[in-house]
Design a protein with these regions (language model features):
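Retroelement reverse transcriptase polymerase core
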Residues: 1-168
Length: 170
């Protein structure tokens, strides 16, 4: 079931490619809930949605994207002036790192400022990093769902400044 269900605390999201597939997935989840004597309050359930906001993401037929309300928060984020503010920004930005190629490399100058032995000095490099992360997060792509019938290949690369991985669907 982990290929079509996301469970977070008391929220369950079931996603599928087709209506027929969704009917089967829904049946499987409801049977599992009944078998385990778990109950869903019908008035709080929504079925057959084509688009849903879930944990800061929008899931639709096109794929998964950043929730527009979060994009607005990122766009309006003012330049961090303390280590705490940098950590807060990196916390939000890091949650969406899967949408940003080279995230760790771009965030490096900001991450370095959060170290205990580093004096807080906002440099031009930090400013560029902050602006680039905001730009990339506010123009993030829609991530598609793999069809699961073909093979995957993992490409990796590492250096002293970052680590990169790509999962390629062939």
């Amino acid at each position: 079931m982990d290929k079509f269900v996301i469970v977070f605390i008391d929220d369950i999201l079931i996603y599928s490619r087709t209506e027929q597939e969704h009917e089967e997935h829904l049946r499987m989840v409801l049977e599992t809930l009944r078998k385990e004597q778990l109950y869903a309050k019908f008035s709080k359930c929504e079925f057959w949605l084509r688009r849903v906001s879930f944990l800061g993401h929008v899931v639709s037929e096109e794929g998964i994207s950043v929730d527009p309300s979060k994009i607005e928060v990122i766009m309006n984020w003012e330049r961090p002036r303390t280590v705490t503010e940098i950590r807060s920004f990196l916390g939000l930005a890091g949650y969406y790192r899967k949408f940003v190629q080279d995230f760790s490399k771009i965030a490096g100058p900001l991450t370095n400022l959060t170290r205990k032995d580093v004096k807080f000095v906002w440099s031009e490099e930090c400013e560029k990093s902050f602006i680039e992360l905001k730009k990339r997060l506010t123009s993030a792509p829609v991530l598609g769902l793999p069809d699961g019938t073909e093979d995957f290949v993992i490409y990796s690369d590492a250096s002293r400044k970052g680590l990169g991985l790509s999962l390629i669907h062939i």
